[in-house]
Amino acid sequence: MTKNEKKSLNQSLAEWKLFIYNPTTGEFLGRTAKSWGLILLFYLVFYGFLAALFSFTMWVMLQTLNDEVPKYRDQIPSPGLMVFPKPVTALEYTFSRSDPTSYAGYIEDLKKFLKPYTLEEQKNLTVCPDGALFEQKGPVYVACQFPISLLQACSGMNDPDFGYSQGNPCILVKMNRIIGLKPEGVPRIDCVSKNEDIPNVAVYPHNGMIDLKYFPYYGKKLHVGYLQPLVAVQVSFAPNNTGKEVTVECKIDGSANLKSQDDRDKFLGRVMFKITARA
């Protein structure tokens, strides 16, 4: 058969059948059983070796890690600040005192966040001495109680609406946890209004003080039940300020090793949020 002649359909099918299985040589897809066995054995050994090498490498790496304390912590020398309730958009709170549905989500978020701080939830925690670092050697680490009454009007104990129904909303501020952090001096969270005509910003506890007894923190697995100290900010809107946007800035102060100013991170140790209360 010349190159220009086309194979018939039967010839093509016969060649394909012969390629798939050749009864004369016993080949399957062009290879004998021995050839297929050697190939499968090679890939089994090859990929088995790769899997074993990967597993061994991971095991060696995991031996260098501590399951309770992160190995590298020097990249986070100073904590940032977070606010609650969680704002719907960016760091802006907007509500109407006459419309409970506008702030119902804020109240629910605050109640959920403060649940671990209730007296019932803290009954198994330790009453720690005030004014000094509470250093522990382990292996058992206890957590200090944080009296929710320190938040006063923003504790939710006497006002389940956290001031929103009266136009005096509460915002909770806390520092991020850093394992082993030992603040110096008398740390506090200072919160002020950036609006000169709205000076009435109350901070609880008094002056936003943070007791040293809540430091150091030993990690989630070791320091079971640990409660972060909180600071509450309450902005009081006068009737003539209804509908006006108020900007509040909170920053860490009073401690030499806790930064609130950094050229590379303008949010280090500080947070700024906006509140708009409508009638």
Swiss-Prot record:
Annotated Gene3D superfamilies: Na, k-atpase alpha subunit
GO process terms (BP): intracellular potassium ion homeostasis; intracellular sodium ion homeostasis; membrane repolarization; positive regulation of potassium ion import across plasma membrane; positive regulation of sodium ion export across plasma membrane; potassium ion import across plasma membrane; potassium ion transmembrane transport; protein localization to plasma membrane
Residue segments, region immunoglobulin-like: 186-279
Intervals, Cytoplasmic compartment: 1-35
Entry keyword Disulfide bond: yes
Segments crossing the lipid bilayer: 36-56
Topological type in the membrane: Single-pass type II membrane protein
A GO CC annotation given for this chain: sperm flagellum
Extracellular membrane side: 57-279
Glycan attachment positions: N124, N240
InterPro entries linked: Na/K_ATPase_sub_beta, Na/K_ATPase_sub_beta_sf
Keyword Magnesium in record: no
Bridged cysteine pairs (disulfide): C128-C144, C154-C170, C191-C250
Cellular compartment(s): Apical cell membrane; Basolateral cell membrane; Melanosome
Homology family: Belongs to the X(+)/potassium ATPases subunit beta family.
Subunit structure: The sodium/potassium-transporting ATPase is composed of a catalytic alpha subunit, an auxiliary non-catalytic beta subunit and an additional regulatory subunit. Interacts with catalytic alpha subunit ATP12A.
Function: This is the non-catalytic component of the active enzyme, which catalyzes the hydrolysis of ATP coupled with the exchange of Na(+) and K(+) ions across the plasma membrane. The exact function of the beta-3 subunit is not known.
Name this protein carries in UniProt: Sodium/potassium-transporting ATPase subunit beta-3
Organism: Homo sapiens (Human)
Phylogenetic placement of the source organism: Eukaryota, Metazoa, Chordata, Craniata, Vertebrata
